[in-house]
Structures are given as C-alpha cells and as structure tokens.
C-alpha cells in the first residue's frame, strides 16, 4: 500500500513538473511574440538612417526606405548617398538579393555579408520578427527585466543564439547579445530613445551595435515614420526591385 502511494506521489510530482516546464516555455514564447508586435506591425513601411562610425571618428551615412509584409517578406531601397541611390535589397525567408541599377539581374547575398559595410550585417538590416528565426530555450526574470535565451531555428540564421534583455513594463528589448555556435560573442545590440510613432506604436527609435571583432567601430540605426501598411505580394519579387521607389 505504502509502495503504491509512493509511486502515485512520484507520478503526480512528475506530471506537475512537466506542466510547469511546459507553462514556462509557453510564457517565454508568448513574451517573445509580444516583443515582436511591440516593435512593429507585421506589415509596415519605415525610413531609416544607418551610420557607420570608424575608430578615427569618420562617419558614413545611408538613408533607406523599407517595406515589410507578413513574417518573411522585406524590401529596402537606398535613397542616399548618391553613389548608392537606386540600389535595393529583397529578403524572402532565408534568401536575399541585391539589385544594382545598370548592372543586370539581382545578385544573391548572404545574411552575414553587409551591403553597407560596418558592424550591421544584412540580417540586421533586413531583420524579421525574432520569433520567426528563434525559439525560446530559457527565460528568467530579475528585477524589472526578463532575460530570454534564444536558439536559431536553423543553420541559415545569422546568429546561432541570442541573449535578450526585455523590460517587463513595456515588453521592449533593451540589450541583445548575438552569439556564434562556438559560443563566441559576435556583437551587442542596444536599443535606445523610446518614441511614439503613432497608432499605439511606442518603441525605441535608435539601435546601436558594436563588436569585439571590429574594435573601435560602431554602427547606428535611426528609425523614422514607422507605420502599418499593406502591400501586394508582387512588391516582394525580383522583378519589382527596380521599381521600389514607386511605393513611397
């Protein structure tokens, strides 16, 4: 009898543990999805200034118009400098292309390359929602912060893992560390300057990054005119790359 009771107690404890573990995982996933929606609508347009800062203080700036649809379609158009004007990039899931006027058909690019140089790579510039590319391995909380440990869904994702610090009260990301599969820190992303973009969208307007691989270099992304907008599927095709300016 005692043996049966002990077995039942162990079984009950095991079930409760499994339930708690499952609930914790679901909470982490739900928080990450809320972070994505707090940062931007699923389909939107925006303008960005990207600034590369070298150790000697020299700066190079780019202005981009960007449109996104659903979870995995994004396109960006270079507006300045004049040497880059008219170039456009397309992302469909894990696939990316660069179009250069008067050069010919679009060329394939990778997530770890950078169309602008600097610390931001193509995955940073054409970034999808975090929950599309990553799963939540673990979540903890301390004070006013959640700490999410994220794992890439597949090997084509630029970073094998992320460590994300999220503010509890706003569910906005504050700091994100990006890691290679070896565990090496590739870069750190820091969000700053909360701004009201309208229609209930209140989020950071500045993203800064640095990397131990590029000591002394820094890149900054400034967001403007971020708003929800719907687009036709034909916009996110190779044939449309020369016509992205018509969206503005």
What are the roles of these predicted feature ranges?
Residues 35, 64-68, 190-198:
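Extended lipid/amphipathic-ligand handling interfaces
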Residues 20-22:
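N-terminal signal peptide c-region/cleavage motif recognized by signal peptidases
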Residues 25-43, 49-51, 58-60, 83-160, ...:
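Flexible, processing/modification-adjacent segments and terminal tails
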Residues 75-84:
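N-terminal post-signal-peptidase region of extra-cytosolic proteins
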Residues 14-18:
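Sec-dependent N-terminal signal peptides of Gram-positive bacterial secreted proteins and lipoproteins
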Residues 44-45, 70:
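Extracellular or lumenal secretory-pathway regions
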Residues 127, 143-238:
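Gly/Pro-enriched, hydrophobic low-complexity segments
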Residues 1-11:
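Bacterial N-terminal signal peptides that target proteins for export
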